[in-house]
């Protein structure tokens, strides 16, 4: 069973991202502060849940959380600062958007939330000096497979996944030949074959290479 709290602080935030391994679409981050009393027997890592279960949990999390935030970082920014930095920046942005300032932050993964904090970029949000100092002032802990251990990270993973899926469903209508409604931008065989046939779109990440055995496609050519 997932644990509710890691640090002992009341305003503990869990944060996670979705879409890191995709060829198209944003990387989406979320942050959630759950109340000190919260129980849900279904809530788990979003990757372990069905689409139906995630859809069921999304409004429950939104209604019962003390606060939450979600943000998208789009391909132009991903291409500029790389996907790892974009993932961390998305989670940093989510912390800043929360209604309450967290007392402690737990992060899914093995990287400190403050890694590459304040990275300069042309696209997307630029952090102010005050925002950087605020993020530095909040203690944080990275937890490997945290979305399968702590409820707030699991809740963040579900919001990140569901909000991103909704976005991919929307842009599918513009470019249905890539079938983003089904593959959500991940490098399925069907998606790779569509890229080979139709080329890339404004929603594709141009910094991502497909290996030679993945239809010999190279975005840099």
UniProtKB/Swiss-Prot annotation:
A divalent metal cation binds at residues 16-17, 108. GO terms for cellular component: cytoplasm; ribonuclease H2 complex. Manganese or magnesium. Binds 1 divalent metal ion per monomer in the absence of substrate. May bind a second metal ion after substrate binding. The keyword Transmembrane does not apply. Keywords: Cytoplasm, Endonuclease, Hydrolase, Manganese, Metal-binding, Nuclease. It is found in: Cytoplasm. Its EC number is 3.1.26.4. Endonuclease that specifically degrades the RNA of RNA-DNA hybrids. Belongs to the RNase HII family. This is Ribonuclease HII. It comes from Flavobacterium johnsoniae (strain ATCC 17061 / DSM 2064 / JCM 8514 / BCRC 14874 / CCUG 350202 / NBRC 14942 / NCIMB 11054 / UW101) (Cytophaga johnsonae).
């Amino acid at each position: 069973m997932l644990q509710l709290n890691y640090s002992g602080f009341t305003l503990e935030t869990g944060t996670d991202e979705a879409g890191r391994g995709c060829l198209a679409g944003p990387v989406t981050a979320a942050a959630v502060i759950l109340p000190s009393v919260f129980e849900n027997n279904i809530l788990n890592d979003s990757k372990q849940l069905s689409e139906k279960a995630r859809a069921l949990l999304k409004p429950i999390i939104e209604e019962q959380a003390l606060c939450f935030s979600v943000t998208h970082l789009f391909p132009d920014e991903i291409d500029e600062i790389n996907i790892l930095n974009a993932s961390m920046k998305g989670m940093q942005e989510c912390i800043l958007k929360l209604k309450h300032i967290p007392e402690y932050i737990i992060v899914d993964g093995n990287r400190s939330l403050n890694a590459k904090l304040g990275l300069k970029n042309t696209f997307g949000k630029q952090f102010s000096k005050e925002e950087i100092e605020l993020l530095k002032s909040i203690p944080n802990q990275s937890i490997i497979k945290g979305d399968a251990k702590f409820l707030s990270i699991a809740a963040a993973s579900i919001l990140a996944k569901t909000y991103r899926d909704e976005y991919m469903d929307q842009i599918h209508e513009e470019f249905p030949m890539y079938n983003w409604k089904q593959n959500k931008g991940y490098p399925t065989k069907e998606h790779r074959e569509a890229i080979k046939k139709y080329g890339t779109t404004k929603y594709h990440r141009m910094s991502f290479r497909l290996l030679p055995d993945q239809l010999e496609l190279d975005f840099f050519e």
